[in-house]
């Protein structure tokens, strides 16, 4: 069983929803990312999602676009992020790590080489925003060999037939996009998200995690009862952008994640975490 599957099983046994924070790898620097990953875990993260910076992150809003620019300016490359994960794994062999990126990044390295290097570093899952399952044959083959889960997005307007097709080849968990638009978009409707998650669950036993538009503890808490995981990105990336030079950035990030964790637990476990 993969680290991702183990973690979701543990969360389910504990009666809590998995918290999946996202940060952009290399922002403000690759060295900082190692420290920030440990801070996320200290705050209660169950899975960590790392964005691989790209010069044209079309699915991302201005906050993450700016983070990608900062990371690239700091010299971040996929190879340096693999080293970040290796260093993280020296102290944390258990927390699942998912890379989120764009097809051009993987194509530049070669699908097989990228997956092989990711697995060797300790990456558990890959989410390629702009690579549909029909075009992921070589990537899927190598991911299967290396034991890396391929995670796919399901949008609110995805047809039932398409949802079933995506779920049939997905691994790890299904990423349910809670809003149309880019990351960091505005208001969520928890009722509609709950219906979306229920539709996905009708065709797969994989955990369903919800992201896009989760901005604060209140919105995370609202979604926690209807999903297996809640993904929070832009709010944390914004904090890193505002306080990147602060010596206490890891503590600030830890406390922000802890607030999310407590709010979610209050709605799913009665506050017992």
UniProtKB/Swiss-Prot annotation:
Catalytic activity field: (1S,2R)-1-C-(indol-3-yl)glycerol 3-phosphate + L-serine = D-glyceraldehyde 3-phosphate + L-tryptophan + H2O
Protein purpose: The alpha subunit is responsible for the aldol cleavage of indoleglycerol phosphate to indole and glyceraldehyde 3-phosphate.
EC number in record: 4.2.1.20
GO molecular function: tryptophan synthase activity
Protein family according to the UniProt entry: Belongs to the TrpA family.
Transmembrane regions listed in the UniProt entry: none
Active site (catalytic residues): 49, 60
Species, as recorded: Halorhodospira halophila (strain DSM 244 / SL1)
Superkingdom of the organism of origin: Bacteria
Subunit-level organization: Tetramer of two alpha and two beta chains.
Any Gene Ontology CC annotation: cytosol
Protein's name according to its UniProt entry: Tryptophan synthase alpha chain
Pfam families, sorted: Trp_syntA
Sorted UniProt keywords: Amino-acid biosynthesis, Aromatic amino acid biosynthesis, Lyase, Tryptophan biosynthesis
Pathway it works in: Amino-acid biosynthesis; L-tryptophan biosynthesis; L-tryptophan from chorismate: step 5/5
UniProt-listed InterPro entries: Aldolase_TIM (IPR013785), RibuloseP-bd_barrel (IPR011060), Trp_synthase_alpha_AS (IPR018204), Trp_synthase_suA (IPR002028)
Disulfide links within the chain: none
């Amino acid at each position: 069983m993969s680290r991702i599957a183990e973690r979701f099983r543990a969360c389910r046994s504990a009666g809590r929803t998995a918290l999946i924070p996202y940060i952009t790898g290399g922002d403000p620097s690759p060295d900082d990312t190692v420290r920030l990953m440990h801070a996320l875990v200290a705050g209660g993260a169950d899975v960590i999602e790392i964005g691989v910076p790209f010069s044209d992150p079309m699915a991302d809003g201005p906050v993450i676009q700016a983070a990608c620019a900062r990371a690239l300016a700091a010299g971040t490359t996929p190879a340096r992020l693999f080293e970040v994960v290796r260093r993280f794994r020296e102290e944390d062999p258990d927390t699942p790590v998912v890379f989120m990126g764009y097809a051009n990044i993987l194509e530049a390295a070669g699908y097989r080489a990228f997956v092989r290097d990711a697995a060797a570093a300790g990456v558990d899952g890959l989410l390629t925003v702009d690579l549909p399952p029909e075009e992921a044959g070589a990537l899927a083959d190598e991911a299967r060999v290396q034991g890396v889960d391929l995670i796919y997005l399901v949008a609110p307007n995805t047809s039932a037939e398409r949802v079933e097709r995506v779920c049939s080849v997905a691994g790890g968990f299904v990423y349910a996009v809670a809003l149309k638009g880019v990351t960091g978009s505005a208001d969520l409707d928890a009722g509609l998200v709950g219906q979306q998650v229920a539709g996905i669950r009708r065709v797969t036993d994989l955990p369903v995690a919800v992201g896009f538009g989760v901005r604060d503890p209140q919105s995370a808490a609202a979604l926690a009862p209807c999903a297996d995981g809640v993904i929070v990105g832009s709010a944390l990336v914004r904090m890193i952008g505002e306080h990147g030079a602060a010596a206490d950035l890891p503590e600030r990030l830890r406390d922000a994640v802890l607030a999310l964790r407590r709010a979610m637990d209050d709605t799913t476990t009665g506050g017992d975490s």
